[in-house]
Amino acid sequence: MMAADDYDLAGFTVGLVDKPKLIDSSRMAAGDVVLALPSSGFHSNGYSLVRKVFDVEKADLGKYYDELGETLGEALLRPTVIYVKPVLKVLEEVDVKGISHITGGGFYENIPRSLKKGCCARIKKEDVRTPALFHLMQKTGS
C-alpha cells in the first residue's frame, strides 16, 4: 500500500514501422559486421539489482569514487540515454540486417534472438568497454 501523499510514475513507448522497413535478419550472411553503441548506465530495468546490491552493502551515495569521477549518487541519477536518434542515423546510412537490445540477459541471451538461423556473432571481449559503474557494482556485490 502506498501512503496518501506518495505517487507512482510509469511510462512506456510504442513504436510503429512501415512493413517494408522491418528488420527481420533474413538477409544476414557470414562476414556481416556487428556495430555497437556504448552503454550509458543501468537504465530502468537494471535498477532493481542496483538497489539490491547497494542497499545490502549500505553504500554511501555521497561518497566520491575516482573511477566514476563523481559520487555514487550522482552516477546513479544520471538520466538514461535514449538511443533512438543514433539508431535512426545508422539506419539512414547503413544496410542494417538485425538489431539487438541488450537487456538483463546480456549478450548471451539477447544477441542470438536477433540472428538469422544458422548465423552466429563473434564479439571480441577486449573490444567491449564496460562502464566503471558496472565494475563498482560487481566489486560491491561480490
Predicted regions and their residues:
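Glycine-/charge-enriched secondary-structure boundary and capping motifs
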Residues: 2-9, 60-61, 65-77, 81-142
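Phenylalanine-focused residue identity feature
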Residues: 12, 42-43, 54, 107, ...
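Acidic, glycine-rich loop-and-beta core segments that form the ion-binding/anion-interacting portion
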Residues: 28-74
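Glycine-rich anion-binding loops of enzyme active sites
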Residues: 1-48
